[in-house]
Structures are given as C-alpha cells and as structure tokens.
Amino acid sequence: GYCAEKGIRCDDIHCCTGLKCKCNASGYNCVCRKK
C-alpha cells in the first residue's frame, strides 16, 4: 500500500515505517515526522 513520506500530509493516508503523524496545536495540517 501507499504510505506518506516525511513532511507529507497524513490526513487520509498513514505514514511510512518509522514516521509518526503529527498535527499542529489546532489539530490541523497533520504531517509525517520522525518518531
């Protein structure tokens, strides 16, 4: 399956291995970051 790389939005797709979906304080603009 497809996964989001680092810095890619993860609103509708999950992040690749070793990455975690993080959002800003408002809970928007979720992007994948290193764990």
Curated annotation (Swiss-Prot):
<comment type="similarity">
    <text>Belongs to the neurotoxin 33 family.</text>
</comment>
<keyword id="KW-0528">Neurotoxin</keyword>
<feature type="disulfide bond">
    <location>
        <begin position="3"/>
        <end position="16"/>
    </location>
</feature>
<dbReference type="GO" id="GO:0005576">
    <property type="term" value="C:extracellular region"/>
</dbReference>
<dbReference type="InterPro" id="IPR004169">
    <property type="entry name" value="Spidertoxin"/>
</dbReference>
<dbReference type="GO" id="GO:0019855">
    <property type="term" value="F:calcium channel inhibitor activity"/>
</dbReference>
<protein>
    <recommendedName>
        <fullName>Purotoxin-1</fullName>
    </recommendedName>
</protein>
<keyword id="KW-1015">Disulfide bond</keyword>
<keyword id="KW-0964">Secreted</keyword>
<keyword id="KW-0108">Calcium channel impairing toxin</keyword>
<comment type="function">
    <text>Inhibits P2RX3 receptors. Has an analgesic effect in rat. Enhances the high-affinity desensitization of P2RX3 purinoceptors. At 50 nM, decreases the IC(50) for ambient ATP from 46.5 nM to 12.7 nM in mouse P2RX3.</text>
</comment>
<feature type="disulfide bond">
    <location>
        <begin position="10"/>
        <end position="21"/>
    </location>
</feature>
<dbReference type="GO" id="GO:0090729">
    <property type="term" value="F:toxin activity"/>
</dbReference>
<keyword id="KW-0800">Toxin</keyword>
<keyword id="KW-0872">Ion channel impairing toxin</keyword>
<feature type="disulfide bond">
    <location>
        <begin position="23"/>
        <end position="30"/>
    </location>
</feature>
<keyword id="KW-0960">Knottin</keyword>
<feature type="disulfide bond">
    <location>
        <begin position="15"/>
        <end position="32"/>
    </location>
</feature>
